[in-house]
Amino acid sequence: MQNNQTKSSWTTKMLVEGALAIALSFVLARFTLFKMPQGGEITPGQMIPLIIFSLRYGAKKGFLIGAVYGILDMMFGGYIIHPIQAILDYPLPYGLIGLSGLFSDEFKRTRSFAPVLKGTFIAIIARYITHVLSGVVFFSSYAPEGQNALVYSIVYNASYLAVEYAIALVILFLLKNFITKDLLDL
C-alpha cells in the first residue's frame, strides 16, 4: 500500500500538537506580567509552544498554528479599531512566530541550538515589524505631540517585545538539552 502523504500534509499527531501549542500559548498569555497602556504585554513565555511546534514541523505549519492562535487571542481580549489593524496585530504577527521553524531542517539534521536561535530571532523581528506598522498607521495619535509616529511605534513596541524575546530566550536556554536531544524523538 502506497503512502499518499506529502511533506505538507497534516497528520493527526501534528493537529493534536498544534492544538496543544495553541492552548498552552493561550494559557501562558493569560498570566500577563505587564500590560502596556495601548496594547502589547509581557507574558511568561507565550511564544514558546508556537516556537517548539515550528521547530518540529517547519515554518509553514508553524505560521498556520500561530495565526490560529492570533485569531483566538484577538477574539478573547483583542483591541480592534480597523480590520487591517486586526490582521497586523493578531493573526499575522503570531503567524510570523512560525518563522522560528525556518531552520527546522537544519535543526533536525544537526540537533544544534544555533538554528533555534536564528529562527527565533527572525520570528521576533518579523512580529515586531507588523506591530510597528500597525502602530504607525493606526495608533500614531498616541505619540507625544511633536514626536514622529514611526519613532514612537518603534520605541513603544520594542519596550515590551524586547522583554518578551528575552524571556523566550531564557526559557529556550533552560530547555536547551530537551530541545536538542529529545524534542524530535517525541
What are these regions (language model features)?
Residues 60, 114-117, 151:
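Residues that define the loop-to-transmembrane-helix transition and helix capping
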Residues 2-8, 13-27, 65, 85-136:
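Short helix-perturbing small/polar motifs within transmembrane alpha-helices
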Residues 25, 29, 131, 135-143, ...:
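Juxtamembrane/transmembrane-helix interface segments of polytopic membrane transporters
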Residues 28-42, 68-103, 139-141:
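Interfacial aromatic-anchored transmembrane helix boundaries in multi-pass membrane proteins
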Residues 1-22, 150-186:
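Alpha-helical transmembrane segments and their cytosolic interface
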Residues 24-29, 73, 96, 126-131, ...:
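Alpha-helical transmembrane segments of multipass membrane proteins
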Residues 1-56, 60-61:
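Hydrophobic transmembrane alpha-helices
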Residues 55-57, 99-108, 174-181:
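Structural signal for the C-terminal ends of transmembrane alpha-helices
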